[in-house]
Amino acid sequence: MRPVINYDELLKKIPYKFAIPIAAAKRAENLKEFAKPYVETWDNNYVSIALKELSEGYIRIKNEEILKVLIPNVK
């Protein structure tokens, strides 16, 4: 059974829409190189596991304060 990841909910936790796939891809690479997943799942898709870890808060984006510059200031 695939983990259900709601991207809109994930954007509420991490407001950097371009950083989420990069962080998930880096974590998926680590999982592919035999890192232990932080969540229990039957899925073997590394990207799905990485996104689930991000959504549950097991992993986070480093230097998040640098990314605050990327949030648009719309008036």
Swiss-Prot record:
Keyword flag Transcription: yes
Keywords assigned: DNA-directed RNA polymerase, Nucleotidyltransferase, Transcription, Transferase
GO BP field: DNA-templated transcription
The keyword Transferase is annotated on this UniProt entry: yes
Superkingdom assignment: Bacteria
A single GO cellular-component term on record: DNA-directed RNA polymerase complex
Classification via Gene3D superfamilies: 3.90.940.10
EC primary class: transferase
EC number assigned by the record: 2.7.7.6
GO molecular function, one term: DNA binding
InterPro entries: DNA-dir_RNA_pol_omega, Pol_omega/Rpo6/RPB6, RPB6/omega-like_sf
Catalyzed reaction equations: RNA(n) + a ribonucleoside 5'-triphosphate = RNA(n+1) + diphosphate
Biological role stated in the UniProt entry: Promotes RNA polymerase assembly. Latches the N- and C-terminal regions of the beta' subunit thereby facilitating its interaction with the beta and alpha subunits.
Oligomer status and interactors: The RNAP catalytic core consists of 2 alpha, 1 beta, 1 beta' and 1 omega subunit. When a sigma factor is associated with the core the holoenzyme is formed, which can initiate transcription.
Family stated for the protein in its record: Belongs to the RNA polymerase subunit omega family.
Name assigned to this protein: DNA-directed RNA polymerase subunit omega
Organism from which the protein derives: Thermosipho africanus (strain TCF52B)
Lineage: Bacteria, Thermotogati, Thermotogota, Thermotogae, Thermotogales
Gene of this entry: rpoZ
